Amino acid sequence: MIEPSHVLKPVRHRLAQYGVAAAAGLAFAGLSLGALMMASGAARADDLYRTEYDISIFGLSIARSAIETTVNGANYNLNGRFLTSGLARVFDDTDGTVHVTGSAVGGKVVPKSFDLAYKHGRKNKSTTIRFANGNVVAAENQPPVKKRDPWVETSPQDLLNVSDPLSALMIPAKNGRAVCDRSLSVFDGQTRAEIRLSFNGTESFTTDGFTGESVICSAKFIPISGYQKGKKAIDYLSNRSRMTISFASLGNSGIYAPVVARIGTQIGTLKIQATRFSKVN
């Protein structure tokens, strides 16, 4: 019999770090209808949107997130809370908040700030990132990252033209297939990675606030810097893991957002699914 604590241990670190997802910079619970509609110019000032996601493995819920986004003109302000749930909460008590700000510039969502704070057991941890013109100008982790040899250092060049894990997955595209024709440059405060997408079909998707077709992208995780070379979890994600992300278009906005992600881990497939994607007022 597999002990629950053994199952959760490989998952919980990234779950805590991103707050709502595991591994590879694929967290997207904070992606909001509000920010997406803002990017298309369709949202009015002070519109409020709410998104909710469930994270599960072996069919068991291990975490939840709830995000509210306020849109004012071209700017968005996102506030969310995430926590472990169900059986996972017995073995791994994580509770935290995330705050992201940014704006729509030239048809792209450009982040300004990313603030993550959470309590993992008895330990308080935080990550802050500041951006200017799409480049990272400051990043801090508390407590500081423990760099274990052989460590791949992050260079200044690595931090140009990147997004935080939440903003990276807001994608403007002419059609569903075009969503997958790209590579996403992501920085989470520690690790710089590329998420290379490729088209893998379509599927229908229904949740509270949305019904329609989604496009499935296969995703390949490519670590660039800010990680321990040879670490088993990183090697598995980059060389063996099977990952897909399903994106859905919001009306005629021309913006696509993830509604389902499946991430193969060493102990099973992690599933992240939107359970609500709607406007509040």
Describe the predicted segments one by one:
Residues R14-S32:
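Sec-dependent N-terminal signal peptides
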Residues R44-N133, G176-N281:
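Acidic, serine/threonine-rich low-complexity disordered tracts
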